[in-house]
Amino acid sequence: MSQKWGLVHIYASYNNTILHVTDLTGAETIAKVSGGMIVRNQRDESSPYAAMQAAFKIADLMRDKGIDQVHVKVRATGGQKSKNPGPGAQAAIRALSRAGIRIGRIEDATPIPHDGTTPKRKNR
C-alpha cells in the first residue's frame, strides 16, 4: 500500500472552524470543509461537534484521493485578535486520528505580530 502524505490546515476561531487539505507543498487544494457546511445554526459553527463531523467528512474525501497520512497545521485568528485556537481545533485533530488517518506532525501556524500595529482601546 502506498503511503501518500497530505497537509491539513485547521483554522479554528471562536466563530467557525475550517479544514483545508492540500498536497505537501500547499499549492494544490484537495478538499475544504467548514463547520458552517455541517450545522444549521450559526452559533454552532465553531462547536467541537461541527469540527468533528467536518473532520470525518474530510477524512472520507482524503481516502477517495488516496491520502492516508497527514501533517497538521493549526491556526488561530492571531494578529491583534485571539492567539488561542477555538474549541474546534482539538476535536478536529482527534476525529482525524479516529477516522484512521495517520497524523505525522502537528504545528501551530498562528500569526503573531512582532510589534505590529497599535491595539485598539483597552488592549493598549
Swiss-Prot record:
Keyword Ribonucleoprotein: yes
Cellular component GO terms held in the UniProt record: ribonucleoprotein complex; ribosome
Pfam families for the chain: Ribosomal_S11
Record has Flavoprotein as a keyword: no
Sequence intervals crossing the membrane: none
InterPro entries on file: Ribosomal_uS11, Ribosomal_uS11_archaeal, Ribosomal_uS11_CS, Ribosomal_uS11_sf
Keywords recorded for this protein, A-Z: Ribonucleoprotein, Ribosomal protein, RNA-binding, rRNA-binding
GO MF entries: rRNA binding; structural constituent of ribosome
Example of a GO biological process term: translation
UniProt region (Disordered), positions on chain: 102-124
Domain of life assignment: Archaea
Protein family (similarity comment): Belongs to the universal ribosomal protein uS11 family.
Self-association and partners: Part of the 30S ribosomal subunit.
Entries under HAMAP family matching the protein: Ribosomal_uS11
Function: Located on the platform of the 30S subunit.
UniProt name for this protein: Small ribosomal subunit protein uS11
Organism: Methanococcus maripaludis (strain DSM 14266 / JCM 13030 / NBRC 101832 / S2 / LL)
